[in-house]
Amino acid sequence: MAKKAREKIKMISSAGTGHYYTTTKNKRNTPDKLKLKKYDPVIRKHILYNEGKIK
């Protein structure tokens, strides 16, 4: 059986609010950790979100 190319990841807020987004990424095309600027509704600002594992 073939291994899945896409992996589920959690994008965790760098502000420490505990807010996160879930998404998928292709681990073959982007082996590095993902960093995206997204909206944090807790502090009502756009901030950096870092990739984390889903447990």
Swiss-Prot record:
Domain of life: Bacteria
Alphabetized InterPro entries for the sequence: Ribosomal_bL33, Ribosomal_bL33_sf, Ribosomal_zn-bd
One GO term of the biological process aspect: translation
Keywords for the protein's UniProt record, in alphabetical order: Ribonucleoprotein, Ribosomal protein
Pfam families given in the database record: Ribosomal_L33 (PF00471)
GO terms, molecular function: structural constituent of ribosome
Cellular component terms (Gene Ontology): cytosolic large ribosomal subunit
Entry annotated with the keyword Lyase: no
Protein family per UniProt: Belongs to the bacterial ribosomal protein bL33 family.
PANTHER family in the record: 54S RIBOSOMAL PROTEIN L39, MITOCHONDRIAL (PTHR15238), LARGE RIBOSOMAL SUBUNIT PROTEIN BL33M (PTHR15238:SF1)
Protein name, as recorded: Large ribosomal subunit protein bL33
Species whose genome carries this gene: Buchnera aphidicola subsp. Acyrthosiphon pisum (strain Tuc7)
Gene name tied to this protein: rpmG
